[in-house]
Amino acid sequence: MSQDVQKVARHMDLLGAEVLAIYPARLTTGKRLEKVAALCGAIQKVSSRQTRAVFCDFPCADIPPALYKKMIRTEGKKYGLPADNLLFTSDIGYPLGFPREGVMELFQLSNLFICPSYSESFGLTVLEAASRGNFLVLNQAVPALQELGEKLGAYFLRWDARNFGFDTRETYNPSEQAYYEDHGRDILRRMDSDPALLAKTLVRTHYSHRWVMENQLLPLLKG
């Protein structure tokens, strides 16, 4: 791991996360970071799998950062994501953004990429996440994300969307929580049925240096 990713790992257990989502984004409500936290919370709630979210955030003047971070944490907790399972890189020494090389390295560790953004003109980050073997969950209401996602075999959810030529509002029946939990189960089933993604996750969680030490070497020494 690079020094930057090691710093993230000192604040959050990256290797032990069964579901690890990385979302690089401006700290603005348009990027809908709270929806990432909510879906991650729902996934953990319906499965009891250790689910963690790392936001590689960089500043934006749209909303006070402390206020928006509190909103995101509150939303995550509401849907089932413990406070310790959510991290902003701006809180650990990267107030102007996490290095791009570090984001790419985190994508190599993660297995889930969620993009509920209001609007996107071209999903470069989606391509970067896909190229590093992440399961993609994209906002179907954003035309650019739908077009790209269809080519990449992404999983779609619907969130509010707004840009030139479209402005949509979503309603969820019976509730937004039920919507996330139902889709969370389906997302996990699809992730489990992807051999390459399953192998990537198992290598990180069960065959890291730490896992080998704790589960294979230390028992031999104690025995």
Where are these regions (language model features)?
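A short alpha->beta transition loop at the rim of the catalytic pocket in nucleotide-sugar-dependent
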Residues: 111, 133-134
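Conserved donor-binding/catalytic core segment of Leloir-type glycosyltransferases
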Residues: 13-31, 37-40, 53-57
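A charged, aromatic-enriched C-terminal amphipathic alpha-helix characteristic of glycosyltransferases
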Residues: 170-221
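A short helix/loop element that forms part of the nucleotide-sugar donor recognition site in Leloir-type
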Residues: 1-13
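Short alpha-helical segment that forms part of, or immediately flanks, the ligand-binding pocket
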Residues: 104, 122, 127-131, 145-146
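Nucleotide-activated donor-binding/catalytic signature segment of Leloir-type glycosyltransferases, i.e.
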Residues: 66-105
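Aromatic "clamp/platform" in nucleotide-sugar-dependent glycosyltransferases that forms part
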Residues: 118
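Short hydrophobic beta-strand element within catalytic cores of glycosyltransferases
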Residues: 135-139, 144-149, 157
